[in-house]
UniProtKB/Swiss-Prot annotation:
Phenotype for residue 226 to A: Reduces transcription activation
In-chain residues carrying the UniProt-annotated modification Phosphoserine: 176, 448
Phylogenetic lineage: Eukaryota, Metazoa, Chordata, Craniata, Vertebrata
Modified-residue entries (Phosphothreonine), positions: 171, 179, 432
Entry protein name: Deformed epidermal autoregulatory factor 1 homolog
One GO BP: positive regulation of DNA-templated transcription
Effect on the protein upon substituting residue 545 to V: In a primary colorectal cancer
PROSITE patterns: SAND (PS50864), ZF_MYND_1 (PS01360), ZF_MYND_2 (PS50865)
UniProt-annotated stretches for the region Disordered: 34-62, 162-190
Disease linked to the protein: Vulto-van Silfout-de Vries syndrome: An autosomal dominant disorder characterized by intellectual disability, poor speech, motor delay, and autistic features. Most patients have additional non-specific features, including hypotonia and gait abnormalities, seizures, which may be refractory, high pain threshold, and sleep disturbances.
SUPFAM superfamilies per the UniProt record, alphabetical: HIT/MYND zinc finger-like, SAND domain-like
UniProt KW Nucleotide-binding keyword: no
Record organism: Homo sapiens (Human)
């Protein structure tokens, strides 16, 4: 059995090589001779086969015939072998049918593009080319221009990704119409790879261990629209996930799955279109006889709040270091982004140093500015200019900063003044004539050597006067606080005494009224007044007269005393 299979394979390969040689020779002769008659080159000798191959290689449009056997898939192969005799060719023809696949080179040499056409694809048996079968080109074609040919059983050819089709077919022959693409291929914009059955009107869905069938035409907003059939009952998506034990999730788009993916994927690809919650269509109302407007669900994105900080980090201005060279001691001025100037170390000047100095500002990590043209002039010392500038230095700004005064021990007698002029980085400073600076002013007063001490002495005296005034005010406030406490205590004692005098004569409680006759006795109620009236009626008028007389005498004495004073 194996011998017969190998013999059949050899016969088939030989027949395929013969057909390929014949087709190549015919194409070469037609291209070379033009209108001349075709030469019969169907010889089966090896010499004619070599001549045909050499002529085919010299021609620009290379045409190669590929034989496809309708035998077992394992016997599909292409190659050139020794040609058999006429008897073997007849046996091969009786064994299987041969289909010719023509490959034409239609592009440039660097494109490596092939197009294919099937001349007799209907003769290929279905069990050999079931679905799609890839045929690889063997030694009969150039290895640099190898490609992949996909043959359908219905005769259509689908080119692989990246291949270019010709402007017009170069090889005559029957061209079968292309097969219509699946719905998934028509869409082309889906994020996931779906089976073509996803475009059916009914989809098998599952939530945990419960399965059902989703009807697309009955899909509503999720909470409404019973579109899932499970057994004989209809459920909405939320009811279906609740029945499966996922009611607490409240997210049916991710709880219910189709083909292993949640329904959210189908919605993102536009395969499912859920309705809005305010939709009043027939599906959402669970009444297919109604005809209301359909409002689709529109996904929304969360808006960013205005007060949210941007995700990109804000670049912080690094402080700039100013180094004065030459100098006897290394001193660095640090200019912060807010404009503050801080110094590290003591600033000293060498009397014998050169007049011209260079000030270099280094900024980290970016390239810093270069400050040049610092000149030491014969002028008086200036006070600080409000801790330099409110903003950091940048290239292109022309400004100046004046250094604060220092103690006289650290300064020469000439009181030099250092002025830093900002220049762009890597720029040559233009020569500018120096001008004598005006004398320094502090609060409108010229600051010189004797006047500076006078100014400081006046400041000290004013501070002492202010301290004395503050001490006096403090003593006055202290005495006032003492008097206030004494007055408060006296008023409290007086109030307690009055409270005791206004108690009821009968029972001792707090009095609410007094006797209208003498105004000296107080009562808490009319009951106490009636009870005490038996004793009080005898002394009510007498006590009043005596009291009044005593009062008059007392007043006269007080008046006499006042006159004497």
């Amino acid at each position: 059995m194996e011998d017969s299979d190998s013999a059949a394979k050899q016969l088939g390969l030989a027949e395929a090589a013969a057909v390929a040689a014949a087709a190549a020779v015919a194409a070469a002769a037609a291209a070379a001779a033009g209108g001349e008659a075709e030469e019969p080159v169907l010889s089966r000798d090896e010499d004619s086969e070599e001549d045909a191959d050499s002529e085919a290689e010299r021609e620009t449009p290379r045409v190669t015939a590929v034989a496809v056997m309708a035998a077992e898939p394992g016997h599909m192969d292409m190659g050139a072998e020794a040609l058999p005799g006429p008897d073997e060719a007849a046996a091969a023809a009786a064994f299987a049918e041969v289909t010719t696949v023509t490959v034409a080179n239609v592009g440039a040499a660097a494109d490596n593009v092939f197009t294919t056409s099937v001349a007799n694809a209907a003769s290929i048996s279905g069990h050999v080319l079931s679905g799609r079968t890839a045929l690889q080109i063997g030694d009969s074609l150039n290895t640099e221009k190898a490609t992949l040919i996909v043959v359908h059983t219905d005769g259509s050819i689908v080119e692989t990704t990246g291949l270019k089709g010709p402007a017009a077919p170069l090889t005559p022959g029957p061209q079968s119409p292309p097969t219509p693409l699946a719905p998934g291929q028509e869409k082309g914009g889906t994020k996931y790879n779906w089976d073509p059955s996803v475009y059916d009107s009914e989809l098998p869905v599952r939530c945990r261990n419960i399965s059902g069938t989703l009807y697309k035409n009955r899909l509503g907003s999720g909470g409404r629209g019973r579109c899932i059939k499970q057994g004989e009952n209809w459920y909405s998506p939320t009811e279906f996930e609740a029945m499966a034990g996922r009611a607490s999730s409240k997210d049916w788009k991710r709880s219910i799955r189709y083909a292993g993916r949640p329904l959210q994927c189908l919605i993102q690809d536009g395969i499912l279109n859920p309705h809005a919650a305010s939709c009043t269509c027939a599906a959402c109302c669970d009444d297919m006889t109604l005809s209301g407007p359909v409002r689709l669900f529109v996904p929304y994105k969360r808006r960013k709040k205005e007060n949210e900080l941007p995700t990109t980090p804000v670049k912080k201005d690094s402080p700039k270091n100013i180094t004065l060279l030459p100098a006897t001691a290394a001193t660095t001025f640090t200019v912060t982004p807010s404009g503050q100037i801080t110094t590290s170390g003591a600033l000293t000047f060498d009397r014998a140093s050169t007049v011209e100095a260079t000030a270099v500002i280094s900024e980290s990590p970016a390239q810093g500015d270069v400050f040049a043209g610092a000149t030491v002039q014969e002028a008086s010392v200036q006070p600080p200019c409000r801790a330099s500038h409110p903003e950091p230095h940048y290239p292109g700004y022309q400004d100046s900063c004046q250094i604060a005064p220092f103690p006289e021990a650290a300064l020469p007698t000439s009181h030099p003044k250092i002025v830093l002029t900002s220049l762009p980085a890597l720029a040559v400073p233009p020569p500018t004539p120096t001008k004598a600076a005006p004398p320094a002013l502090v609060n409108g007063l010229e600051l010189s050597e004797p006047r500076s001490w006078l100014y400081l002495e006046e400041m000290v005296n004013s501070l002492l006067n202010t301290a004395q005034q503050l001490k006096t005010l403090f003593e006055q406030a202290k005495h006032a606080s003492t008097y206030r406490e004494a007055a408060t205590n006296q008023a409290k004692i007086h109030a307690d005494a009055e409270r005791k005098e206004q108690s009821c004569v009968n029972c001792g409680r707090e009095a609410m009224s007094e006797c209208t006759g003498c105004h000296k006795v107080n009562y808490c109620s009319t009951f106490c007044q009636r009870k005490d009236w038996k004793d009080h009626q005898h002394i009510c008028g007498q006590s009043a007269a005596v009291t009044v007389q005593a009062d008059e005498v007392h007043v006269a004495e007080s008046v006499m005393e006042k006159v004497t004073v």
